[in-house]
Structure formats: C-alpha cells, structure tokens
Amino acid sequence: MYIAHTIDELRSHLAAFRRPAFVPTMGNLHEGHLALVKQAKPLGDVTVASIFVNRLQFLPHEDFDTYPRTWDSDCEKLRTAGCGVLFAPDEKALYPEPQTCKVHPDPALADILEGHFRPGFFVGVCTVVMKLFQCVQPRVAVFGKKDYQQLMMIRHMVRQFALPIEIVGSETFRADDGLALSSRNGYLSEAERAEAVQLSKALKAMAQAVQAGERDLAAIEARAMQALAQRGWQPDYLVLRRRSDLQAPSSANLAGEPLVALAAARLGGTRLIDNLEIDAMPS
C-alpha cells in the first residue's frame, strides 16, 4: 500500500491509473469502513482511502481534539483489506491557508435533521469532500448509508457541480445485535453498549408501524422518542421522511413512496445516529 502525505505525492502516484475508486474516512477504522474498501476494489483500477480528521465539520463543543487517532491499526487494516493507496494529509497539507472558499449545500437538505442540530456541519463535510475529490480525482466513490443525509448531500453536490464521479451507497454494517458500527461506539461504557441496540430497535418499530398500515406518522415518531427517553436517552430526532428528499411525507398519500426512518440520540455522553429504509407501500 502506497502512503501519500501530500497532494503532490498523491497525484504523482495516481497518474498511472485511469479509474481510482475512493473511500474517504476520518480513521479509527472498523469493519464498516473496511467493507467500503472491499466494495470499492472491483469498481476501479486502484482503491484509494483517505484518513483525515476534518476540523471544519466539528462544532466548538464537539470531539475534534479527542476523536480517536489510531494510525498504526488503521494502516494494518487497510493493507489487509487490499487498499492500494492511502492519502493521509496533515492539516497543513490539505488546508495550507485558511479555507475561506467553502461549499454551502442546499439549505433544504443541509439545514434539517443533522444540519439543524449541528449547524455548519454539512458545510464542513461538503468542503472537505470536494477538496478530497479534487486531490484524488476518483471515477467512483463509496459512502456508507449509515450517514444517510450525508450520502444524499454528496450526491446532490456531485450532480450540481457535474463532477464525473459515480457515488455508490453501501449498506450499513451492523454488529450481531443490530447496532450500526461507528467510530464513536468506542466511547460507550459496557452498560451503554448493551443499551445502544435500542436505537435500531426503535427504528424497526417505526418501520413496522408504517408497514402495518398506521398512517399517523407524528404519533409513530412521538412513540419512538418517548420510548428512548424513558430508557434514559436524550433523543434529538426520530423521524419518517421521504427517501427522495428527506422531507416529511403526507400521511394521506404514502402509497408508492419509499421512506426512511432516521434517528439521532445521545446515550450518556455519546451521540449515535442510525437509519432504516422502508419499502414503498403498495397503491
């Protein structure tokens, strides 16, 4: 595995390839990340992963300084997964001067859900992904569906800027009990880890209610919020949205509309997110 620490090193090495397949990460890799790398391998002639903890997408009170940096372990995992190139710039390499030119995504998508609770988050995400795209020049990039809103944002950005990049969404990788894998799961205590599965269970209960014919979506959402709150969680949102644009669907017109249940909630000091796609109801 070739490791590039500067943009020039990366571009020089990738000049020999025609179809890079790219997986951007912030490190602290788990099996979910490695599944993305393995999915990317047959999609290009070289698989490129990046590790960069992007300051721009962290709010002042969030965990930028304490976000786990696990360099040696990450490199070994990527080698084992068959990654061909690792781009691991430091902050000075990727942001040699203050990043005053930023990507401000569509507020209709960026200012709801995660964007509402983490203002400016998607500006930071889209800006760093655009910059990484310019460095790697991939023909395909693989993102996990666990960050559902982020995936939609990246697809929208690629479409709006006519970037010649195919965006592939990969299914969420889960532990045996159903918990979505996340780098932040490591913050959980043993007791919190046992409790954390309740987030995916709440999403399943929401999906089952819709599939059983219940049409009062606000009531479904309220039940899910209450169920977690009663267990000691601090939920930000548990909502049912259209998959097409993440807007609230009409309860009276759900036929043929694919939905997604999305959740964000804090358990102790750890904020977890998850989602579950729901098949369209028959007409």
UniProtKB/Swiss-Prot annotation:
(R)-pantoate binds at Q57, Q150. Coiled coil: none annotated. The keyword Cytoplasm applies. Keywords: ATP-binding, Cytoplasm, Ligase, Nucleotide-binding, Pantothenate biosynthesis. It is found in: Cytoplasm. Its EC number is 6.3.2.1. Beta-alanine binds at Q57. Pathway: Cofactor biosynthesis; (R)-pantothenate biosynthesis; (R)-pantothenate from (R)-pantoate and beta-alanine: step 1/1. InterPro entries: Pantoate_ligase, Pantoate_ligase_C, Rossmann-like_a/b/a_fold. One of its GO terms (biological process) is pantothenate biosynthetic process. It comes from the Bacteria. GO terms for cellular component: cytosol. It is an enzyme of class 6 (ligase). CDD domains: PanC (cd00560). ATP binds at residues 26-33, 144-147, 181-184. It catalyses: (R)-pantoate + beta-alanine + ATP = (R)-pantothenate + AMP + diphosphate + H(+). Its main location: cytoplasm. The active site is at H33. One of its GO terms (molecular function) is ATP binding. The reaction proceeds by a bi uni uni bi ping pong mechanism. NCBIfam families: panC (TIGR00018). Catalyzes the condensation of pantoate with beta-alanine in an ATP-dependent reaction via a pantoyl-adenylate intermediate. Belongs to the pantothenate synthetase family. Homodimer. This is Pantothenate synthetase. The lineage of its organism: Bacteria, Pseudomonadati, Pseudomonadota, Betaproteobacteria, Burkholderiales. The gene is panC.
